[in-house]
From Swiss-Prot:
Keyword check for Hydrolase: yes
Protein name (database record): Glucosamine-6-phosphate deaminase
Reaction(s) this enzyme catalyzes, per UniProt: alpha-D-glucosamine 6-phosphate + H2O = beta-D-fructose 6-phosphate + NH4(+)
Pathway it works in: Amino-sugar metabolism; N-acetylneuraminate degradation; D-fructose 6-phosphate from N-acetylneuraminate: step 5/5
Length: 265
């Protein structure tokens, strides 16, 4: 597993890395680049930089197919806190990705189980995901794979923990009662099937999760630790998010990644 310890803005690094991978891949209509995408606060800077790169002519999303990580159950698609709304407002509306290339879970599907099974099959039909990007919760969850989730789990409906709902209440007028209790989410196994996984971590409140991801063993109570099992897992952090790491751990990764901090590769 790689750790990219930055001063700030892990989203900038991820955007540059992804753009480089897309260009190298040279996608076409017959062979698109398949990208897994997150929501939340930390990825906003990644989307802004991807939009900047697109406007500068450095990357196109015309032949990119996207799959999002998760969606709340019961929120209308046009609700300001639905992930459909988030993705279009923060990314899709600003780049050249065709509408038919966008895949998002339907949190209002009449049969959530069938919706999740179909989503998994659609990923398989596209040949799998090249890069899946995610964030991490304060309790170490990735996507909505809450603590004690199976590390081989697939896309499914999940009950959100009190901690997750409290953390997300900042997007719902700080009223936890407005935060949905359920969500559809890709599984840990779904993420691990991707050819590469990038996890973004920003802020002191993510520092404990980062330490469990890097310095502790694989543990289903900290689902981010499953990144250790991936052949091409990358954890991109700002300085605050590394505060719980041992000094020698941080020094080690700074030394081996010194050439990649400003030139993502």
């Amino acid at each position: 597993m790689r750790l990219i310890p930055l001063k700030n803005n892990p989203g900038w690094w991820a955007a540059r890395y992804i753009a480089g991978k897309i260009k190298t891949f040279s996608p076409s209509a017959e062979n698109p680049f398949v990208l897994g995408l997150p929501t939340g606060g930390t990825p906003i800077s990644m989307y802004r930089e991807l939009i900047n790169l697109h406007r500068a002519g450095e990357v196109s999303f015309k032949h990119v197919v996207t799959f999002n990580m998760d969606e709340y159950v019961g929120l209308p698609e046009d609700h300001p806190q639905s992930y459909h709304y988030y993705m279009h407002e923060n990314f899709f509306n600003h780049v050249d990705i065709p509408k038919e290339n966008i895949n998002l879970l339907d949190g209002n599907a009449p049969d959530p189980e069938k919706e999740c099974e179909a989503y998994e099959q659609k990923i398989i039909n596209h040949g799998g995901i090249q890069i899946f990007v995610g964030g991490v919760g304060t309790d170490g969850h990735i996507a909505f794979n809450e603590p004690a989730s199976s590390l081989s789990s697939r896309t499914r409906i999940k009950t959100l923990t009190l901690e997750t709902r409290m953390g997300n209440s900042r997007f719902f007028n700080n009223n936890m009662e407005e935060v949905p209790k359920y969500a559809l989410t890709v599984g840990v196994g779904t993420l691990l099937d991707s050819k590469e996984v990038i996890i973004l971590a920003s802020g002191l409140n993510k520092a404990l999760a980062v330490s469990y991801a890097v310095e502790h063993g694989v543990n289903h109570l900290w689902t981010v630790s499953a990144l250790q099992l991936h052949r091409k897992g990358i954890l991109v952090c700002d300085e605050d998010a590394t505060m719980e790491l041992k000094v020698k751990t941080l020094k080690y990764f700074k030394q081996i990644e010194v050439d990649n901090l400003q030139d993502p590769k």
